[in-house]
Amino acid sequence: MFGLSPAQLIILLVVILLIFGTKKLRNAGSDLGAAVKGFKKAMKEDEKVKDAEFKSIDNETASAKKGKYKRERNRLNPCLILVFQNLFY
């Protein structure tokens, strides 16, 4: 691992413990854990917001399509509607 033997890793860990102390390392670990937890929570909330936006866009498009076709039918001559239906179906 990183070109270090197990003995060198143990010595490195002991030096780090002596420099920072166990209390600071514990605090750093808990701070890192809280940061990761907050990041995951923010990602889940962002996904919920995106899902809600997509659903609202889908609903808007569906209602716009329904309204558009109704308006088109009201504007066209009923005879033309029958002719077009026979041509395309």
From Swiss-Prot:
Membrane protein topology class: Single-pass membrane protein
UniProt xrefs under InterPro entries: TatA/B/E, TatA/E
Transmembrane segments: 1-21
GO BP of this protein: protein transport by the Tat complex
Compartments where located: Cell inner membrane
GO molecular function: protein transmembrane transporter activity
GO CC terms of this entry: TAT protein transport complex
Keywords: Cell inner membrane, Cell membrane, Membrane, Protein transport, Translocation, Transmembrane, Transmembrane helix, Transport
Entry superkingdom: Bacteria
Main location as per UniProt: membrane
Functional description taken from the UniProt entry: Part of the twin-arginine translocation (Tat) system that transports large folded proteins containing a characteristic twin-arginine motif in their signal peptide across membranes. TatA could form the protein-conducting channel of the Tat system.
UniProt subunit comment: The Tat system comprises two distinct complexes: a TatABC complex, containing multiple copies of TatA, TatB and TatC subunits, and a separate TatA complex, containing only TatA subunits. Substrates initially bind to the TatABC complex, which probably triggers association of the separate TatA complex to form the active translocon.
HAMAP family: TatA_E
Family: Belongs to the TatA/E family.
Protein name per UniProt: Sec-independent protein translocase protein TatA
